[in-house]
A protein has these predicted regions:
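Bacterial N-terminal signal peptides that target proteins for export
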Residues: 1-13
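Short, solvent-exposed turn/loop segments enriched in Gly/Ser/Thr/Pro and often Arg
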Residues: 172-175, 225-229, 425-432, 496-502
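Surface-exposed helix-capping loop/turn segments at secondary-structure junctions
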Residues: 124-133, 212-221, 281-286, 412-422, ...
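Hydrophobic h-region of N-terminal signal peptides that target proteins for export
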Residues: 16-24
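Substrate-gating cap/lid region and adjacent catalytic-acid/histidine neighborhood
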Residues: 257, 261, 289-469, 480
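Serine-hydrolase-like catalytic core of hydrolytic proteins
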Residues: 102-287, 317-320, 325-352
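Non-catalytic accessory segments of hydrolases
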Residues: 10, 23-195, 459, 464-477, ...
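Extracellular structured ligand-interaction cores
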Residues: 44, 115-119, 134, 163, ...
């Protein structure tokens, strides 16, 4: 089954495709052969990139930051990339990592999938050769099962024009990125397995620290930012001792390792399940035999598993403990945080399933799920009418999927961290394509992943009837994001004031849309209720 990631929502660990569709189209890659070459020397050798057609950005694509994780390196932490002599062309995206075709709204411009996929890209202002500009490292989303840096909406050229160096990196996914067989733990020397995709991200950050000065970037001013699984990754990197000192600020767009959406399990549990998968689906539990199998055979077997079957775990190495404990004890990395989510992260179908979306069915659902707490739940998610029940079901699915986990992350960083925290909600209503409109009353305002094109200034990557207000919102978000990367404060001249997240100010939230402004948190009671439930922890 292929899904629209924009239409995804979750109830607990189960993700269900919503009913509406967003039309997407790829922007054709620019003909790099017709553009002026540019050069940079890294620790591994010299690179030849291209200058953008307006002369403002230097672009380097497909830079190897680790050795290809193939053969004996399959399911091992990333190893150093080989150096080269001469000049290496860096004009095309590296292959995306092994993945099944899952999300129809993902459009790629690379020659993957392939196990040989650990490549990154750099966009640097052309005037930055001798400067030390802020660096922003992007981590894509896709449920840890899909994604690539070659998606048109994640092109870093326009964002770089705001005076930052933008980096994006591929990382291993699905069974190739998060397989935690017990034999892997034994051979690791650390009793750790899985989380190879997250260790790839750490290795990319190490590459940035060693090499980004060659592109005009400041290795002492690095911000990581990501969306969905990329935002989950950011919350994990903030918690991980392996990433300490590699970045200085963090931006999370819709997601964190809190709550039940993508619950981290201990290695002992995931290892047992993964060994059984190998034995039953691939016919062997031997790591040597599994490494000898074709990648396509392993990928095909993983496609038969439930969604998010292979995902990060508590391995004792990348994550010494669960993230809640790490944050609660104040042991996370001391970085500033800007995080939030979109107004409509979920869809009511995640709650009703095949049942009619009525008030009666929503109340029955509340009684079944919450028992004695159903009355309290319905005060926060009312269902006096069918229309109100649909809205509450959509709110609850979005809260449990994305809003609550991200809120909990913000709260814990605010309570236990040592640096400022900023919170937002993306409210900008997407324009609809002329040949498609949802049913009346069912149009989401700002669905999951809708902010990506705005953040990157890449509205042109999708065939939608964009309005002048969309372009203004995009410019606003780029300014906020890059200001935060530059100074740790998103505010700047001419921008609506964004207050720091604080109990003294009503936990104010920056609502980002055509009339952006900060308001006190209107839904704090909902998140506190969810936080009080044992299943939310």
């Amino acid at each position: 089954m292929r899904l629209q990631r924009h239409g995804w929502c979750a109830a607990g660990a189960i993700l269900i495709a919503a009913t509406w569709v967003v039309l997407c189209a790829a922007e054709a890659p620019k003909g790099s052969g017709e553009l002026k070459p540019t050069y940079a020397r890294t620790a591994n050798g010299e690179l030849e990139g291209v200058v953008s057609d307006d002369g403002k950005v230097r672009i380097f694509r497909g830079i190897p930051y680790a050795a290809p994780p193939v053969g004996a390196l399959r399911w091992k932490p990333p190893q150093p990339a080989a150096s080269w002599t001469g000049v290496r062309k860096a004009v095309e995206y590296g292959a995306r990592c092994m993945q099944n075709r899952v999300y129809d709204d993902m459009v790629f411009r690379d020659n993957g999938p392939s196990e040989d996929c650990l490549y990154l890209n750099v966009w640097a202002p052309a005037m930055a050769r001798q400067e030390r500009l802020p660096v922003m490292v992007w981590i894509y989303g896709g449920g840890f099962v899909a994604g690539s840096t070659s998606e048109p909406r994640q092109e870093g050229e326009n964002l770089s024009k705001k005076g930052v160096v933008v980096v994006s990196c591929n990382y291993r996914l699905d069974v190739f990125g998060f397989f935690s067989h017990p034999e892997l733990a034994k051979e690791s020397g650390r009793d750790a397995a899985g989380n190879y995709g997250l260790m790839d991200q750490v290795t990319a950050l190490q590459w940035v620290r060693r090499n980004i000065a060659a592109f005009g970037g400041d290795p002492e001013n690095v911000t990581i930012f990501g969306e969905s699984a990329g935002s989950f990754s950011v919350s994990g990197l903030v918690a991980s001792p392996l990433a300490r000192g590699l970045f200085h600020r963090a931006i999370g767009e819709s997601g964190a390792f809190f709550g039940t959406t993508l619950q981290l399990k201990p290695l002992a549990e995931t290892g047992k399940a993964d060994m059984e998968f190998a034995r039953s689906s691939l016919g062997t539990a031997s790591i040597e035999a599994l490494r000898a199998k074709p990648a396509d055979e392993i990928l095909k077997a993983s496609a038969k598993e439930r969604m998010l079957r292979f995902s990060p775990n508590i391995d004792g190495y990348f994550l010494p403990q669960d993230v809640v404990t790490i944050y609660a004890e104040g042991r996370q990395n001391p970085v500033s945080l800007l995080a939030g989510w979109n107004a409509d992260e979920g869809g009511y179908d995640a709650i009703f399933g095949q049942d009619p979306p009525t008030a009666q069915n929503f109340k029955a659902y509340a009684s079944k799920l919450f028992g004695g707490n159903a009355e309290a739940f319905l005060r926060l998610y009312p269902a006096a009418t069918d229309a109100e029940a649909r809205r509450s079901a959509q709110d609850f699915s979005g809260d449990r999927f994305i809003a609550f986990p991200t809120w909990k992350w913000l709260e814990m960083q605010y309570q236990k961290g040592k640096s400022p925290v900023y919170r937002y909600r993306f409210d900008q209503t997407l324009p609809w394509a002329a040949d498609y409109r949802p049913k009346p009353g069912e149009e989401p305002a700002a669905p999951h992943a809708a902010e990506i094109e705005y953040v990157f200034g890449m509205l042109s990557s999708r065939k939608l009837p964009w309005r002048s207000e969309d372009r203004r919102v995009s410019d606003l978000m780029q300014s906020y994001w890059t200001n935060f990367a530059r100074t740790g404060n998103p505010n700047g001249q001419g921008l609506p004031h964004w207050p720091v997240y604080s109990s003294k100010d009503g936990y104010r939230v920056m609502h980002i849309d055509a009339a952006s402004g900060a308001l006190p948190d209107q839904h704090r009671a909902r998140y506190l209720f969810l936080d009080s439930l044992p299943t939310s922890r």
